[in-house]
Amino acid sequence: MFSDCVIDESNSSLLSWLDYSSDGCQTLWRRGQTHITCSCDHLTYFGVLMVNSSPSPSDQKILSYITLIGCSLSLFGLSITVLLFISHKKFRADVSMKVHISLVFALILLNVHFLPSEMVAALSSTSLCVYMALALHYSLLATFSWMALEGFHLYLLLVRVFNIYIRRYLLKLSVVGWGVPAVIVSLVVIIDRTAYGYTPVDSSNPNGTAICYVTNTTAMMVTTMGMICLVFLFNVIMLGVTVRRLISLRQGQETNRSSTTKDIFTLLGISTLLGITWGVGFFSVTTAGQYVFCILNSLQGFLIFLWFVMSLRKAQKAAAEIRNDTQTTSGPKSK
């Protein structure tokens, strides 16, 4: 008897038995074996990092392509952002930019380990999958650590304003941003050595698409969802402080279209750095929520790249205006 591995592409229709496809699936069987191993290489989607839901096969396929395109664009944009940071001396001397670039590195790690995770899960190497799962979890936690530090840095700039000097400020931020995730991952490994590895995207279908991630549901909920909740709440408060600050600065001033547009882009840029869009994950139990979550968060790195480019153009424009003012004030030199 011949057996073939397939994936269910039905939507619970009456003709669901016709909706099976072997595309992307490989049947692994040797003569004499009593079981068949199926290896399917269908892409997964960004929402699995937060929510264990089960969209229809057609929606899952679309979400997978959205994630692939979004993460690829983000990885490209983040790489260019690093080059822009290195090539501009003013960026390298700016403390805020150094905080931003740390978040950029964390997002690069996240995308680098998320994109091949499903492909690695389809391989037979358990140790490689464990490494990928551990690295992916660490990268996600580091990303949220740096987004929280973005909120803290914003608090110092907008609320404290004066007397904000902190000795070895960037070193202390780095210890928290990179060290806390390492401690959390180490504790998970100490408590449960099998906490990382092959993890089905849909828990109700263990033979379906899988990635290398946290296998222990409790560890995932406590470390991942717990940290995301805390960071999201803190950064929402920081965003509220920013809005209040912008409103107070505009009081007594004549508002125009230009200033309003500038404030909107400022808030959008800050929201991206603070990871506010990750809050959509709490409402992504629906298919529509999954689409919004995947689009916004897979593109987070690319949006940060656009924000960096706009900041660079703004800095260059300001420098040009200063040079023009200096030349106008000094006037032509007499012989």
Where does each model-flagged region fall?
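Short secondary-structure subsegments characteristic of cysteine-rich extracellular domains
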Residues: 28, 102-104, 294-300
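Hydrophobic alpha-helical transmembrane segments corresponding to the first two to three helices
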Residues: 29-31, 35, 39-44, 48-192
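Intrinsically disordered, low-complexity regulatory regions enriched in Ser/Pro/Gly/Thr
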Residues: 19, 29-33, 75, 167, ...
